[in-house]
Amino acid sequence: MDEFHRCGKEDSFWQQCFLYPLFFQEDLYAISHDHYLDVSSSSRPMEHLSSNDQLSFLTVKRLIGQIRQQNNSIVLFVNCDPNPLADRKKSFYSESVLEALTLVLEVPFSIWSKYSVEGMNESKSFRSIHSIFPFLEDKFPHSNSILDARIPYYIHPEILVRTFRRWIRDAPSLHPLRSVLYEYRNSPDNLQRSIIVVPRVNTRFFLFLWNYYVCECESILFSRLKRSSHSRSLTHGSLPQRTHFHRKIKHIIIFSRRNSLKSIWSLKDPKIHYVRYGERPIIAIKGAHLLVKKCRYYLLIFRQFYFHLWSEPYRVCSHQLSKNCSSSPGYFLRVRMNPILVRTKMLDELFIADLITDEIDPIVPIVPIIGLLATEKFCDISGRPISKLSWTSLTDDDILDRFDQIWRNLFHYYSGSFDRDGLYRIKYILSLSCAKTLACKHKSTIRVVRKELGPELFKKSFSKEREFYSLRFSSKAAARSQRERIWHSDIPQINPLANSWQKIQDLKIENLFDQ
């Protein structure tokens, strides 16, 4: 494998590399066996690991011999060594062979993704959720419309195999992949008769399929957008106030010297910006309504003809930023004008000018969050707190920790909003629900619980925002911070409540299109 990486700099080597002989190397299955045991030991206790979870090279050689026969290539999902102690649908050796298949396919994919990203100087790769928030502040104010799309999950297995053939010319190495995909497609549990490519499946094989599928979609989409655009990419540089500098070079006029006539080439950047969080890409566009409709139509046709998928119209929605829209993960978005007073002194004269800039204003969706809290039995539909009966069997510390975790996630995720008053209503619901849960556990009232526990009741919980402001701001700065947006950098993933709320919004959009 190191030889593949060393030779990957050659343009055609990674396309013509022969991967099929790697399937018959015993070292590959030893590596996959170790990785599988690491994942299994982290998800299962040690007492559930039996002696059958040991690698036998005799069984591996038997599997390799069966893989050599084309008629028995479907052996990847056959119970070769069943383990009665583990309640799993696939055998231990089937998982090991599947891990080995993933390791082989990851070699050319890693080389291709590495050198394709290095060759794209004008584009930047967003690899973390933390890059979404600078994108909202830096890119969105320059756009007047956004396209909220959803990557389709269901795809035919033969389409995946054909896309692999574009950069792997070793056809025999794709036979095991085709066998795995069709076996999964024909399984009794799969009612859609297609491959479900989702990023939440915690297996290395499906995570690899998801990364490859998304990378293929984005690479083809970016190349088409680059060809359709007649303007070259303009970088704004790294300045403290990149927003204003970006506005200055928005329109550049170049006069042609070759023609005596006054031919003008306008480098008018169409302002198409792209970011993706999970399976939801966002495309911010600055242009007329006709341009937005063309981009939306292009995305639908692109999916239909390139991946041979029928894409429902509700999977690509367009919104205007002048109105409230639910396009960002868990936020209502709107653009507001922010006036800035600029004083310029030249010699003895002082000039005062008002500079008006557009600024994105994410709004906390209070009503949907209350609805989700009501679904999770923290309050009723009107927002009245109730006790969490399913948590009464836990200890007091566990109850406080769970409520504290929910509030900390909500506060950190929505701290970038200007108007954070609605968050304190959520805090009131969670704190009173916590008190009622403790009172229900001890079979008493809220007053008795507060009297017995005293100030220790909420000393540990619901105090993260006070610690944050006291550690980082003085009194004046803390007051100013209420008018400024602060993005926390300890958000590991998108808030689960935001995902649930986004699913509800998607169902509403689907119902509108059905009507």
From Swiss-Prot:
UniProt xrefs under Pfam families: Intron_maturas2, MatK_N
Gene Ontology terms: cellular component: chloroplast
Subcellular location: Plastid, Chloroplast
Magnesium as UniProt keyword: no
A single MF term (Gene Ontology): RNA binding
Major location (coarse): plastid
InterPro entries: Domain_X, Maturase_MatK, Maturase_MatK_N
Annotated GO biological process: mRNA processing; RNA splicing; tRNA processing
Keyword Oxidoreductase in annotation: no
Alphabetical keyword list: Chloroplast, mRNA processing, Plastid, RNA-binding, tRNA processing
Stated role: Usually encoded in the trnK tRNA gene intron. Probably assists in splicing its own and other chloroplast group II introns.
Protein family according to the UniProt entry: Belongs to the intron maturase 2 family. MatK subfamily.
Protein name in the entry: Maturase K
Organism: Pinus leiophylla (Chihuahua pine)
Chain's gene name: matK
